Structures are given as C-alpha cells and as structure tokens.
Amino acid sequence: MINFSKLITAVEITNKTNDKIAAFVDYFTHAPDKDKLWLIAIFTGKRPKRPIPSGVMRKWCMDITNIPEWLFLESYSTVGDLGETMALLLPEPTHQIEKSFSEWMQDIVELKAKTDEEKEAYVRYAWSGLEAQERFIFNKLIGGSFRVGVSKKTLVNALAKYSGIEANQLMHSIIGNWDLNAISFEALLQGEHINYDNSKPYPFCLAYALEKELDALGSIKDWQ
C-alpha cells in the first residue's frame, strides 16, 4: 500500500499532466505486475463491490476514538469526506502492515463473504497498521468511493510512455472486458484478450451531418 499511497499523493498534489504521467511511469517501472493490473482496473472503473456500509465503518471509528456522534459529524462537516475524516481521527498506528497493493485489493474482494465480526476485526487491524494517508486510501477503496483526478487518457499516455505501445492500441486493450485474475500485465497491454468479432466492429470514423442536399451528392450507385 505504501507505493500506491505515494503514487496517489504525487498525482493529487499537481495539476500538471506531465507530472502525473511521470508519477505513473515511475509506479509502472517499480511495482509488481499484479499491482499494475489492479491499478489499471481501479482507474478504469473495475472496482470491487463495497463489502462494508460506510455507516458501519463510521460506528467502528467512533468506538475506537470514543468520540460522540455530534463531534464526529462536526468533524465530517469540516473535512468534507467520510474516509478522510476517519483517517484523521483514528489514533496513530501501533505497527506496520507489509502488504502489496494487490494483496490489499484481494482482501477487500474476499471480505464480502466474511461475517460481520470478521469484517470488523479486519478493518480494526488494518487501521492500526496504516499511516493516515494509507488509511484514507484504504477507506475509499473499501467504501467503494475511490476517486482521483486522473483521466483515462492520462493513464493511457503513461502506459504508452512506459511500454512504447501506441496509445490508441492501449486504450482499446484496457477499456474492454478483461479479468485481472486470468491475464498477465504484458498480455493486457498487448491486447491478447480482445476478441476481434466481425459482428461487433469498432467505429472507424466520426459521423458528421451532410453539408449538401442528397440530390447534390450524386447517384447512390456510384458510392462504394
């Protein structure tokens, strides 16, 4: 989570596209392939379903901090984001959890099938082993509300710079249907999962309104 947290911080503190691209390229250069796959999934709308309601997490946070509800709500009103509010109110971590980004995401996927007691124990343990920024990201991921000001185009351009593959080809590859548990990072970039079904052709040009009357265009028979 540390490296992913650093990436998110890097892209949030700048409004320069080139700086955002550089941060992504650095991440793609050093992160494990599974982490890269999860990053692409998250940024292209393939987030796992929320395993825990936000109201339940808020209650756990108030229990840990012994903060009354009115004070929590005042804090929430000031901060403006529930995940960040909880991350700031929780006490300092008592230990450090060494897990990759993909391991955290796999935990979140599997959490859906856990009991309420297991979910609470997991979240409390995670909170006690993460720094404030890492907690904030964890809260957003587990709450299903992770959003970062990075467009798909920026992500694709970063992948193009990292891989040397054309941006248009990459856009086609990562936006389509793919299963991160059934594909490698390299195979995804190469588009090996794409089924080029002739019955579902991709548009090859934009449609524009005719500038002339139909009669002025000549006979339909002359069009190929």
Question: What are the residue ranges of the model-derived segments?
Answer:
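N-terminal nucleic-acid-engaging modules of covalent nucleotidyltransferase systems
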Residues: 1-224
